[in-house]
Amino acid sequence: MAEIDDYILDVLMRDLVGHDRRPVSFLVYLWLSAEEARRGEAVEVSYQELAECIGISKSSAQVAVGWLNKRQLLTTKKGTVTATPRYTVNRPWRDAKLRLERKGRAAR
């Protein structure tokens, strides 16, 4: 079973579901995060497969991915326009924490 970062449940869920009113975006983020952890690499999956795995419509998956990209919580890459997207889950709170730790070490 994939581990869920505390930040995802404590902060991100409220932000996406409550503030942004995008619960499907939270489900997509959660599923992609778990799948990336299982595979150990970015997740290559079509909108249709993504939708079926989560139990949502294809158009809802497309909108959710677009929102997550806009929020910079997801990076999407495609080799060609018609290629299957490859998703990398971004965790900006971890990056910020690392920057602060490095800054603290450099100041010593």
Q: Language-model segments: which ranges?
A:
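Short recognition helix of helix-turn-helix/winged-helix DNA-binding domains
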Residues: 1-53, 82, 107
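Winged-helix/helix-turn-helix nucleic-acid-interaction surface
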Residues: 62-108
